[in-house]
């Protein structure tokens, strides 16, 4: 990245980044299109659940942008130890936050759906769809972290591929599960879940060849050795991204 021509470098990083950010919206678009052929209640259920999905994505961007920005700075300073610690911290933090969101969401699924505007006729569909979507919260949040960390290390193309594969798989699985297997709105939710796990797997297990720093539990546990100044920097990088994502899709 320090020797490549600037125009080519910008194109190589900007185009995959734009595509990756657009593709994250395809999950809801695909689900809305196909469940719209079932009934209006199913369409409303997907719309109601989108607010929760936006919150999950916000935490993914929060951890991903913050850790990725920090990693790129540490790599430039040749501080590989701190970069490795932050890579693990961002990844495992997002995964644990996703687990917490899933747990709380499933425990309070009924009141959450009602608070988001579910009517008595929409409520069963919303609970079915959102309940399955919440199971994928850890994978959705952490895959966004992996995507952002790889982009900040200059591997924007592979980061884009990992996200695109999941979106394309979702578009293919939606009609199969909804209509062929007659699973209805549950099929749309399971399609999204499977696709997100697929993206997560590609980025996690095939990414190390292109990612300079692995995500190891020892590095995560040693996060406490990061200086207070570095932890403050990480938060200052993270907050604008996470807050912006939430404000883009207000509840």
Regions picked out by a protein language model, each given a short descriptive name:
Residues 1-17, 71-138, 180-238:
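Short alpha-helical transmembrane segments in multi-pass integral membrane proteins
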Residues 17-69, 133-140, 202, 228-251:
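Transmembrane helix-bundle signature of multi-pass secondary active exporters and lipid flippases
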Residues 26-29, 37-40, 74-77, 152-153, ...:
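Helix-loop interface residues and adjacent transmembrane-helix termini in multi-pass membrane transporters
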Residues 43-103, 140-159, 251:
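Small-residue-rich hydrophobic transmembrane alpha-helices
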Residues 55-58, 170-174, 199-204:
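Hydrophobic transmembrane alpha-helices of multi-pass small-molecule transporters
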Residues 62, 103, 167-168, 197:
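Hydrophobic/small/kink-forming positions within alpha-helical transmembrane segments
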Residues 94, 149-175, 190-193:
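Alpha-helical transmembrane segments of multi-pass membrane transporters/permeases
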């Amino acid at each position: 990245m320090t020797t490549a021509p600037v125009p080519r470098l910008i194109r190589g990083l900007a185009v995959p980044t734009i595509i990756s950010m657009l593709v994250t919206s395809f999950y809801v678009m695909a689900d809305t299109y196909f469940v719209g052929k079932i009934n209006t209640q199913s369409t409303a259920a997907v719309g109601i659940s989108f607010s929760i999905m936006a919150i999950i994505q916000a935490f993914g961007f929060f951890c991903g942008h913050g850790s990725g920005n920090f990693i790129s700075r540490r790599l430039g300073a040749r501080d590989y130890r701190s970069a490795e610690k932050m890579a693990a911290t961002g990844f495992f933090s997002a995964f644990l936050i996703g687990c917490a969101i899933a747990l709380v969401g499933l425990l309070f699924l009924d009141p959450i759906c009602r608070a988001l505007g579910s009517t008595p006729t929409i409520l069963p569909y919303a609970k079915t769809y959102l309940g399955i979507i919440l199971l994928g919260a850890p994978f959705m949040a952490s895959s966004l972290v992996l995507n952002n960390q790889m982009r900040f290390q200059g591997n924007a193309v592979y980061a884009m591929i990992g996200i695109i594969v999941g979106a394309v798989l979702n578009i293919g699985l939606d009609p199969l599960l909804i209509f062929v297997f007659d699973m209805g709105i549950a099929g749309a939710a399971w399609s999204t879940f499977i696709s997100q796990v697929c993206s997560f797997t590609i980025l996690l297990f095939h990414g190390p060849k292109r990612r300079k720093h692995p995500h190891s539990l020892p590095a995560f546990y040693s996060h406490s050795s990061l200086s207070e100044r570095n932890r403050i920097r990480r938060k200052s990088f993270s907050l604008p991204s996470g807050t912006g994502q939430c404000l883009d899709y207000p509840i």
